[in-house]
């Protein structure tokens, strides 16, 4: 017998253990006539007449195609509503993610991320219209942030207690030669005495139709510099020296290097310094040859390419070499004197700190520390090189670095999250290895979501001072450069022994707007949260203190910024 599910199943009290099936209107052979539900429910249950337990499973069976017709019509309507609802929900979630508000939709991390603003950095201004909004947000999340601080502070304390600024073991010259046989065969031990830059003549065996830049890797992999090399190619044959039926080209290395650091104003310094008539830079502002290209690295995550030979690097200085050659070949003493004052510079901001390639090429490490560093090779060829370093409060440097290199979902929350993750990774390394081993650890550096290690200036500077004299360095602060450009540039001129500028030249150099400033869309994001700033200040404090001690200048402790 068939009965309607809405009105025909009744259970007696537990003690009776019986199930009675009676329709209120009596049994009906056709459930369409059920007086209670009027046939609106087409799902039928077939219940045996046997005694059943309360949790017994009822068997569901279809009772002919006519019974499913209404159900399918009902299901199609619901199904359309469900699909439409899913589409709306997907669009809402996508808008949250794209707007950077996805933190509320995701499972929270071990630390809570909220927001309230810190003071904007010295060089990067903030949009005033966003201040009230950031202030309101900070009030909401302040308690959550402060709850996280003790846990993060334990990580920082763990790192701090393991910091040791040890003296590195210097490699022998013969060991360096074994690593770079070709480079040592190309660059001579002595340079021309009447040139301020390290230059020498080498024989050119090609004909006047030979393209000297045909295989240059910088030309092959970078289209924007091809026009520069086209001009060099056309003028090449006219700048050769000829003697005894042979042809010679002048080769030069930089007289000085701007070696670091990233997001510390090196581009601005480069742009101003290149306005001086006695300064000639490489054809490319940042060749990154010493740290990356000579190992075949363009982007480390993309793997290794063919190594750029030293000849490709030397080609970048041909424009300056042509002018120096003119001076050396000039007939008048005045012309010789003018051209011989030219100095060559190079401004790769990776030179000071980036030694990530060593793990791929040097297998004789000591306790995880690299056996050779970039400065070892530069010193082997240029023991008298001049080195300029521009530094910045490492806390602000890191945030500027994050805003510049992060591609999407940038926010103060995301930055805070990445900082805490990087600190945890750095601590894990410090538990097993020395400070130097962790700073130069390629695996760690690639794993950290922000480049925490770049701000450890004291570690890098001490390693550079292990091979170069302190007098060969000019260490500048971006904060000082921003407040008094003229004073900073005069210090650079004096350090490089450059001649004075005319009033017009100096005005052009000092009044030009800052280069490579923060992008408007990044300024609109506002500053990092104060608790993030506090965490980073705690982390960098011992490194800044050591730097200030080495330089005998408390300004490099960044206590008041």
UniProtKB/Swiss-Prot annotation:
Keywords: Disulfide bond, Glycoprotein, Golgi apparatus, Membrane, Signal-anchor, Transferase, Transmembrane, Transmembrane helix. It is found in: Golgi apparatus membrane. Its cofactor is a divalent metal cation; glutathione. Its EC number is 2.8.2.33. The chain crosses the membrane at residues 81-101. It is a single-pass type II membrane protein. Signal peptide: none annotated. Glycans are attached at residue 364. The keyword Metal-binding does not apply. Inhibited by phenyl beta-GalNAc(4,6-SO(4)). InterPro entries: CS_Sulfotransferase, P-loop_NTPase, Sulfotransferase_dom. Gene3D superfamilies: P-loop containing nucleotide triphosphate hydrolases. GO terms for molecular function: 3'-phosphoadenosine 5'-phosphosulfate binding; N-acetylgalactosamine 4-sulfate 6-O-sulfotransferase activity. One of its GO terms (cellular component) is membrane. Expressed in B-cell-enriched tissues but not in fetal or adult thymus. Expressed in fetal and adult spleen, lymph node, tonsil, bone marrow and peripheral leukocytes. Not expressed in T-cells. In pro-B, pre-B, and mature B-cell lines, it colocalizes with RAG1. It comes from the Eukaryota. The keyword Phosphoprotein does not apply. It catalyses: dermatan 4'-sulfate + n 3'-phosphoadenylyl sulfate = dermatan 4',6'-bissulfate + n adenosine 3',5'-bisphosphate + n H(+); chondroitin 4'-sulfate + n 3'-phosphoadenylyl sulfate = chondroitin 4',6'-bissulfate + n adenosine 3',5'-bisphosphate + n H(+). Glycosylated. Residues 102-561 are lumenal. 3'-phosphoadenylyl sulfate binds at residues 263-267, 392, 400. Its main location: Golgi. It also transfers sulfate to a unique non-reducing terminal sequence, GalNAc(4SO4)-GlcA(2SO4)-GalNAc(6SO4), to yield a highly sulfated structure similar to the structure found in thrombomodulin chondroitin sulfate. This is Carbohydrate sulfotransferase 15. The gene is CHST15.
